[in-house]
Amino acid sequence: MLMKPVKIKDKILKLPIIQGGMGIGVSRCRLAGAVAKEGGMGVISTAQVGYDEPDFEKDPEGVNLRALPVQIRKAKETAGGKGLVAVNIMTVTQLYEEYVKTVCEAGVDAIISG
């Protein structure tokens, strides 16, 4: 089956597949970057994205917000300009607006919310 590329604004998904956002250490920069490198949309989950940082227990939300730009940058580096890197943000998250602002400032290609 031939899958046609999909254009989203000025970006092209060579492979129109969106990797699902899976939280707490699954959907982070390595997986999202690898999917994007193959021409799909890799997705970083915001759910406890900074769980492995040493100060996570003291300030989990602050650490998660700090970890996101790093995760986005690393995913984009892995992708090498291919595909798209998105972030999945649950709308019930207490700091939803802060997450959206943070990932937009970090240059994410798309946001998936639900």
Give the location of each predicted region.
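Active-site entrance/lid segments in N-terminal catalytic domains of soluble metabolic enzymes
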Residues: 1-114
